[in-house]
Amino acid sequence: GAQGQHVQEKAVTLAAARDLKAALERTGRYRVRLTRDGDVYVIHGRRVQIARDAGADLFISLHADAGSDPALRGASVYTLSEQGAGRAVREFTKGDDWQRDLRLPGRDASVDRILLDMTQRATQNRSAQFARVLLTHIEGDNHPLLRRSHRDAGLAVLLAPDVPAVLLEMGFITNPEDERVLSDERARRRLMRSVAEGIDRYFREPAAPVMVAGDIAGG
């Protein structure tokens, strides 16, 4: 991971994840599963699988950005790109039991593929909705945002076809002020409270639920 002047990305992201977990669990409305709770590396595909196995309604990957220009600072959020969506479908349908994994009938591969595409489109829409809400809450707490703060990419942690997901770059660990915020317990917890408030708002907003393919197939 990235290295700041005084702290490492892997340390501040784990601390932030624990802060966010505590903030969400205090509400009594959420069950939170961390993909790691120590100084271990979890491969990207395994992180996605942990979320899917848990039946997650939302997946957030926390990171700290790095850049060659120390003046660069601010948070940004990534959601899955169209190119990444195509990759996700190809990766997901490699296995022999992908239809069973999504509770599809398995009688007609072309129909099942359409249902998978519908599921993924709904998931992408919900991910984008959460990204907008999240950025609003982060900015509202006077935390700086990177220019063009909502971005898309084909990142491996965003590839689940049925779990809305974002990657949050909390700031630039190579910027002294962002590094201070991420390494200072009080400032970091304040940022994570903003994230928790964004999650609350996301789940309160009226929106069509993400239909998994098996639900669509079943009518």
Residue ranges and their predicted role:
Residues 68, 116-217:
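Active-site-adjacent mobile loop/cap segments within catalytic or ligand-binding domains
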Residues 1-108, 121-132, 189, 212-219:
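Catalytic-core regions of hydrolytic enzymes
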Residues 110-114:
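Short, basic/glycine-rich phosphate-binding loops at helix/coil junctions
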